[in-house]
UniProtKB/Swiss-Prot annotation:
Propeptide, chain numbering: 19-57
Organism: Hydra vulgaris
Protein name: Arminin 3a
Function: Antimicrobial peptide with a broad-spectrum antimicrobial activity. Keeps its antibacterial activity under a wide range of salt concentrations that mimic physiological conditions of human blood, which is surprising, since Hydra is an obligate freshwater animal with nearly no salt tolerance. Does not affect red blood cells.
Signal peptide: 1-18
This protein's UniProt keywords: Amidation, Antibiotic, Antimicrobial, Immunity, Innate immunity, Membrane, Secreted, Signal, Target cell membrane, Target membrane
């Protein structure tokens, strides 16, 4: 009789640990997903802020940027046209 109770007790402990393990695994998975989403939201906010800064530039600043890019356009077109 003692052996039966011992086996039942050990089985109960094993099932409890298995449930706890699955719960723990699920909690860890949810925590990691939540952290990933938070990081992505922060990066998205940073990108939006940088985009706003770029678009908020004064027109003459945009012209200066364009002026520095224009000389490279023929070289890019020539390189793209070669086979």
């Amino acid at each position: 009789m003692k052996t039966v109770f011992a086996i039942l007790f050990l089985t109960f402990i094993a099932l409890t640990c298995a449930r706890n393990y699955e719960d723990l695994k699920e909690k860890i998975k949810n925590e990691v997903e939540r952290e990933i989403f938070e990081d992505l939201e922060e990066e998205s906010d940073e990108l939006e802020n940088n985009f706003k800064k770029f678009n908020d530039a004064k027109p003459w600043t945009r012209w200066i940027r364009w002026k520095t890019i224009v000389p490279f356009i023929p070289a890019v077109i020539a390189a793209a046209g070669k086979k």
